[in-house]
Amino acid sequence: MYFFSRKTALALVITCSALFFSCNKTEKPLPQQTRSELPEIKQSPRFSGISQQAKTVESASMQGSVWLAYFFFTSCGGPCPAMNARVEALQKEFSAPNLKFVGISVDPETDTPKALAAYAARFHADSTRWTMLQMPMDSVKSVAVQGFMLAQGKEDDPNLHSTRFVVVDKRGMIRGYFDGLDENEIPKLRKAISGLLAE
């Protein structure tokens, strides 16, 4: 009887020890995925235009990249230079090749590829990442209003274009809008870009 008790006790000690060391084994934490908290608003519009390099560029070419879209025109003396200066700063800050910038002219009659090329050079635009586009005015309106859901100005008045930046993720989903002239919006924009690049 005494032998059985010692044997049982020994088995219990071994079992408890095994459980103790098993439960106290340090496990490597699972890597956390960094995801943006921005909502998925809607699919970005399809479009096609002529770039500052006189090449046809389609929105499908942005697939797999995070991109920022905005509207401007080269003869604009108001918000456009400030907005393009913002984009220039973002281009310099973020070196990721899968971050693109797309500026769409709201004055296609004036903003020929040659005019866009001169304007792009003014802001040191890297043509592999920053595209300025000319497209027919009806396409501009459709892309801006129906596609990106931006406010529409008065008929044929390019001065009334939106000053908002539209941020699109790698799958082509619109994820946010940021006022390109509001200093307080820029840190939020930079955070959004960082988050989407990490997705």
PLM regions and their residue ranges:
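Thiol-/selenol-based redox modules, centered on thioredoxin-like
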Residues: E155-E199
